[in-house]
């Protein structure tokens, strides 16, 4: 959904070990974003849907659950949004995303994979594209030093497996101080990754709007003074 000229979309990057393709961090087409906005099971590579659904069903039948990853791409955020310290773009987005239940981790750009590379491999060279300055690659995920670079903002959020499963689990009895077993009754989602996509999408929208309002409020105050 749009925030002015800002657009963001999420997709299911993985369910368990079944993976979808990731966003091209440099070139994300409007057509892809539009297609993802109309789908209930949001995938870049639609052929991943069947094995993902089969894995979820297997977990349901075995009274278990499975986690996964949601990837988000944000286009059109102006250059210079954010702060180099505590109000950086990563800080604000992460704070909002960690408010979503079951989120256990977040990475931006090349993330943890980038930690395996040399600086010469992970750095993003700047180039002119007409009158616009861009980077050839986007390992920084659209954020440098807490401030937007104008490239697409890319992050991935890890969703843990649903804790409420119908299998017997070891626990403790607080009254008797003894070890015991817990058996949960009722209906529980075997995978909440699919449900998490629109939640993370809207949490992201709030974070980006908050960042942009801060930026333009400061500019307005400077202009008034």
Task: Locate predicted features.
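Hydrophobic alpha-helical scaffolding
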Residues: 38, 42-46, 79-87, 96, ...
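Internal helix-turn-beta structural module
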Residues: 154, 162-221
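A structural signal for short, well-ordered beta-strand segments
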Residues: 10-12, 72-74, 155-157, 204, ...
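Glycine-rich anion/phosphate-binding loop at the beta-strand->alpha-helix junction
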Residues: 62-179
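Short, small-residue-biased leader/transition segments that mark boundaries at the very start
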Residues: 2-7, 223
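Active-site helix-to-loop segments that bind/position phosphate- or nucleotide-bearing substrates
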Residues: 5-74
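Short, mixed-charge aromatic SLiMs
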Residues: 14-25, 119-121, 177-182, 225
């Amino acid at each position: 959904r749009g925030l002015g000229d800002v657009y963001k979309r999420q997709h299911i990057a993985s369910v368990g070990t079944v993976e979808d393709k990731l966003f091209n961090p440099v070139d994300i087409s409007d057509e892809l974003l539009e297609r993802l906005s109309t789908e209930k099971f949001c995938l870049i590579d639609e052929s991943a849907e069947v094995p993902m659904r089969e894995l979820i069903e297997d977990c349901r039948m075995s009274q278990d659950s499975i986690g996964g990853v949601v990837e988000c791409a944000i286009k059109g955020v102006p250059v210079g949004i954010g702060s180099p310290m505590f109000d950086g773009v990563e800080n604000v987005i992460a704070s909002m995303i960690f408010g979503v239940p079951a989120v256990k981790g977040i990475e931006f750009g090349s993330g943890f994979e980038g930690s395996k590379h040399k600086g010469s491999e992970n750095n993003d060279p700047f180039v002119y594209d007409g009158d616009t300055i861009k980077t050839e690659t986007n390992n920084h995920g659209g954020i440098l030093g807490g401030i937007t670079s104008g490239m697409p903002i890319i992050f991935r959020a890890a969703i843990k497996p649903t804790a409420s499963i119908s299998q017997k689990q070891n626990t403790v009895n607080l009254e008797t101080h003894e070890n015991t077993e817990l058996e949960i009754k009722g209906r529980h989602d075997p995978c909440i990754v699919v449900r998490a996509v629109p939640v993370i999408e809207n949490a992201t929208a709030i974070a980006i709007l908050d960042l942009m309002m801060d930026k333009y409020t400061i500019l307005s105050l400077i202009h008034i003074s």
